[in-house]
């Protein structure tokens, strides 16, 4: 039985494109205007800081010799395909799940582009309190985390809200 793509969660793929444009645009601006390691204070506790991440979150496996680039690229592709299939199986009206999946796909594809094009992921958001700095991250990472948080939130909502 075929169904109109507009009636499925794939209707929300426009959000993937928005995340990609914002993420890749921010990384382009950093690459054009910052030297590696440059820092510009924005607000108390928030800097723009150009860093390269050769691993995953928190630079996991960053010093592993290069194989991790392809490993994490494969994970990004696999997760994106799985979530796109899940979106296809969902109704377009199931907003929370579709938004969550679209944010995760957009973030995964943004970081995938960096891995394949540059060989590293461009990070630039430096949050700190006093002398303690959180791991530097980017807007793709933010989209992935917000998407994951929405999935957790959806799990706590009453079942009637889930069916919409």
UniProtKB/Swiss-Prot annotation:
Membrane association type: Multi-pass membrane protein
Entry EC no(s): 3.4.23.36
EC supergroup of this enzyme: hydrolase
Keyword Cell membrane included in the entry's annotation: yes
Entry annotation: catalytic residues: 123, 141
Pathway this chain belongs to: Protein modification; lipoprotein biosynthesis (signal peptide cleavage)
Membrane spanning residue stretches: 12-32, 70-90, 102-122, 137-157
Keywords linked to the UniProt accession: Aspartyl protease, Cell inner membrane, Cell membrane, Hydrolase, Membrane, Protease, Transmembrane, Transmembrane helix
Organism domain of life: Bacteria
GO biological process: proteolysis
Keyword Protease found: yes
Coiled coil feature spans: none
A GO cellular-component term linked to this record: plasma membrane
HAMAP family in UniProt: LspA
Entry similarity comment: Belongs to the peptidase A8 family.
PANTHER family, per database record: LIPOPROTEIN SIGNAL PEPTIDASE (PTHR33695:SF1)
Name of protein: Lipoprotein signal peptidase
Organism from which the protein derives: Shigella boydii serotype 4 (strain Sb227)
